[in-house]
């Protein structure tokens, strides 16, 4: 089994590596049915070392975490790599895929100029528009039990935000939790977003 994810943080959390790192895929958009990147160079034409080839050929399961962030062209690039060193006639070389994620979370990142080119081949930038994936008969399993939260009211609030239903009651509940001037202690493990970190700098400018 090999575990990969689209970003470094997601890969660390999943106990794996990034998709680009494992498959040595360039960051340029991938053109389906071609081994060429946008600049016309054969960026996808290279050889893996014996150790990597052995890993790919012995792989029975490929786990992709945070699948909502994976672009369709990236998934097709993975398909090409697996077909190259396994069964060229089967999607993803015949490797079983387990894709984990929430489509209501982060979307794939695609620049306007990249999408102008990719839109010729894909209906959407999301992974489910992958040509290789459309050749498979995959099944979807929805996980409904929440294990991270035990507070029913808080869970309901999170679900409302997730579904973009921020009514006055939700906003009031969130505002009651706001603590002006709050300074967390380092040992408590709070996570600060870049927006909060950069806000004082913008005010002083």
Predicted features and spans:
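Conserved ATP-binding/catalytic motifs of P-loop helicase motor domains
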Residues: 1-202
């Amino acid at each position: 089994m090999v575990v990969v994810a689209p970003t470094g943080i997601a890969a660390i959390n999943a106990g794996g590596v990034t998709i680009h790192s494992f498959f040595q895929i360039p960051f340029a958009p991938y053109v389906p049915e071609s081994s060429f990147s946008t600049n016309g160079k054969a960026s996808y034409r290279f050889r893996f070392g014996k150790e990597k080839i052995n890993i790919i050929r012995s792989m029975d399961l490929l786990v992709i975490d945070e699948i909502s962030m994976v672009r369709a062209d990236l998934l097709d690039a993975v398909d090409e790599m697996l077909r190259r060193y396994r069964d060229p006639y089967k999607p993803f070389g015949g490797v079983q895929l387990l894709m984990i994620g929430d489509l209501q979370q982060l979307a794939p990142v695609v620049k306007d100029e990249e999408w102008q080119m990719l839109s010729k081949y894909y209906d959407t930038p999301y992974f489910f528009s992958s040509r290789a994936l459309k050749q498979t008969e995959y099944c979807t399993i929805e996980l409904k039990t929440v294990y991270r939260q035990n507070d029913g009211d808080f869970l309901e609030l999170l679900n409302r935000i997730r579904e973009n239903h921020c009514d006055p009651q939700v906003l009031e509940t969130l505002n009651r939790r706001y603590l002006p001037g709050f300074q967390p202690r380092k040992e408590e493990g709070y996570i600060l977003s870049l927006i909060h970190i950069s806000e004082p700098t913008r005010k002083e400018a």
